Structure formats: structure tokens, C-alpha cells
Amino acid sequence: MENGATTTSTITIKGILSLLMESITTEEDEGGKRVISLGMGDPTLYSCFRTTQVSLQAVSDSLLSNKFHGYSPTVGLPQARRAIAEYLSRDLPYKLSQDDVFITSGCTQAIDVALSMLARPRANILLPRPGFPIYELCAKFRHLEVRYVDLLPENGWEIDLDAVEALADENTVALVVINPGNPCGNVYSYQHLMKIAESAKKLGFLVIADEVYGHLAFGSKPFVPMGVFGSIVPVLTLGSLSKRWIVPGWRLGWFVTTDPSGSFKDPKIIERFKKYFDILGGPATFIQAAVPTILEQTDESFFKKTLNSLKNSSDICCDWIKEIPCIDSSHRPEGSMAMMVKLNLSLLEDVSDDIDFCFKLAREESVILLPGTAVGLKNWLRITFAADATSIEEAFKRIKCFYLRHAKTQYPTI
């Protein structure tokens, strides 16, 4: 794999997507092509992805009750914390309590909390590559050294555990595991997660489990929470309502100590958590108050519909990728909302790298893809498939036209 020459600390996904949008000069109302974005992981951009009526009613009832217009406790409303503990406990061999749960403003704030709590002089953290660039941004702000562990596309984007052992030392504080995977669309097996836990225990660090895409698994492997292995190694579980309930703008996330052995039960650690949350601003109180109803009353049919839509969209992507020689995917998505495809520059006449590809594609075809450099892999592309079938079909038709326009001329051999 070719890794990004530009570190993700200098690039944000939203930043580069904004630049790509700005590069599109044609306007639809002036006869230009409709802009299709397969770059941002926000399913609400497409009408086929909508949250449940249960969620909407719960928030409406909470807001109109006039009971939740004031400040909430800094760690979150007790009833919301309790509901999240019960929700996560369904998939664990032990029960969480509300004291294990801290409510955050989206999963991004949970990431910042986790890294802030682990920061200390000379500490380092192991991050997956490709991954989510917010981790490196937060680490840099907290003066945490970042060490990258490559994911292996030939093995379904599994973590290279030999590399983990080679990179870790006495100052390694944690390994980040994103499952289901963003940006790769992978889902880790029980066996692989067990090996991760055993490696972390052996090497003496904890695991940060980013499960913002939790349960969004539509392949052959079911979603297994990292917290299942909490008795082997301490796990900090990060998650949110954003993806599974299709409400990223509600900013309701959680930071959870999935740790039945009690490593985080030290009064000094708990007090440090609470003091840090005292300086944070959590989600709106009325959103928190709706959480118990949302978690307890959402019908399973809603989740099945979402999974069916994501699988159908990912299948359309995979079928089209076979028709475009300059992009290739060795791994069919099994979950989340995105996938990585490799760019074959040798087949293109005047495209220098993944960033050049994406900017020229945006200008010429009004299609937005995310350059792999933004997530740590140069000359790869991240494609988000949380979109309707019509938009995906049209986007890939344009990508194919772009390829044909820029394909190297094949001269006949004499």
C-alpha cells in the first residue's frame, strides 16, 4: 500500500470536500450537471435514508414537555445514561451501569475525551491507516505521538497485529479499532477482535473501540462489540445515535467504560473523567431526554430497511467498479457506509495522483469523491454508498465517462 505523503493532520475530510465543491463551476440551473456527492458520510442528504417516526416523536414530546430546557448534568441526564447502558449491555456478557456512560456531543467529542484522558508526556497511540483523521488531529492537540498501524486490504482490512507488536512500547497507551470500518467498509470477526484484545493485554495498553457504525453490518459477519473482550483488556467504547438512527446532526454520542474488571473504577480516574466533562458542552438536554424512548421503542424493521438499502447501494458500486478499469476494490463492503478503491494511475493520461483525480472529476463531471490521502492512503479513493440507487448509478456513469476521456491511448503492437 502507498501511504499518504501528506499527513492527515493537515487535512480534514470536511475541508477537502468543501474545496472540491468550490471547484465545481457549473450550476444546475444554468444547464450544468447536478452535483452528486459520494464523499460525505451523511445519509440524510438522500431521501431514502430517514430516521424513524419514533425518534421524531420522542424529540418532539421532550421539547414540548417544557421539562428539558435547562442545563443537564455535565456527564449527561441519568435516564439517558441508564438507557445507553442497557442498550449496549444487550450485546455484552456482563451488564453496564449508568455510571459507565458519559454522554458527549457526537462521537467526535467522545474521541477528544478519550485522547485527552490518555495524554501524558512521551505517550503514543496506535491509529489504523486508513482511518478517521479526527484521531490524529486530536492527538496532535494533546501532544500524543501517533504511530500508524496499516490495515491489510488483502485480509479484509484486518489490523496488522505483527505491526502492532513492532510499534508498541512502554509508552503506548491505546490502540484505536474502528468497527464496522470507516473508511473501508469492513467488519471484524470475533476471532480477529479476540486476537486484538490478547495483543493489547500482552503489550500493556487499552483499546479504544470506535463503534459509531455499530450494528451496520450487512455481510456474512455479524457486528461484535469490542466490549465483549473487556474482561481481557480494558475497552473505551465510543458511539452515537448518528449513523444507526440516521441523525448525525443531533450530536448525541457516548463515551463508555466497557471494563468488567474495574480498571476504570479507581476513584481518581472517575473524578478526572467528571472534571473533564465539567468543561465540555454536551448535547441539548431535550435530545438527551428522548434517548430512552428512541433506544427502547425503535422497531427492528427500521434497522433492516437501512441495512438492505446500504447493501443494495454497495452492490451497485461494486458492479460499476468492475466496468471502470482505473479503479479496483479487492474487498466487497460488509458494513458501515463507505469503501476504499485503489486508483491505477498507469491507465490515465494526465492525472498525477488521487487529489488531482478528484478535483478533475469534480470540475468535469460534478461528482465528489474523497481522495484517499485524506484518510491516509495516497492514490486510493473513498466512496460513500449511503445514497440512493439513482444517484449512485448516475455518478458511476460519469466516472466511467471521465475514465474514457483520460484513458491512455492504447497503440497496437506491430
UniProtKB/Swiss-Prot annotation:
Keyword entries, A-Z: Aminotransferase, Pyridoxal phosphate, Transferase
InterPro entries reported for this sequence: Aminotransferase_I/II_large (IPR004839), PyrdxlP-dep_Trfase (IPR015424), PyrdxlP-dep_Trfase_major (IPR015421), PyrdxlP-dep_Trfase_small (IPR015422), TyrNic_aminoTrfase (IPR005958)
Gene3D superfamilies per UniProt: Aspartate Aminotransferase, domain 1, Type I PLP-dependent aspartate aminotransferase-like (Major domain)
Gene Ontology biological-process entries: tyrosine catabolic process; vitamin E biosynthetic process
Highest taxon, organism lineage: Eukaryota
Coiled-coil stretches: none
Cofactor needs: pyridoxal 5'-phosphate
Family, similarity comment: Belongs to the class-I pyridoxal-phosphate-dependent aminotransferase family.
Cross-referenced PANTHER family: TYROSINE AMINOTRANSFERASE (PTHR45744:SF2)
Name by which UniProt lists this protein: Probable aminotransferase TAT2
Organism, scientific name: Arabidopsis thaliana (Mouse-ear cress)
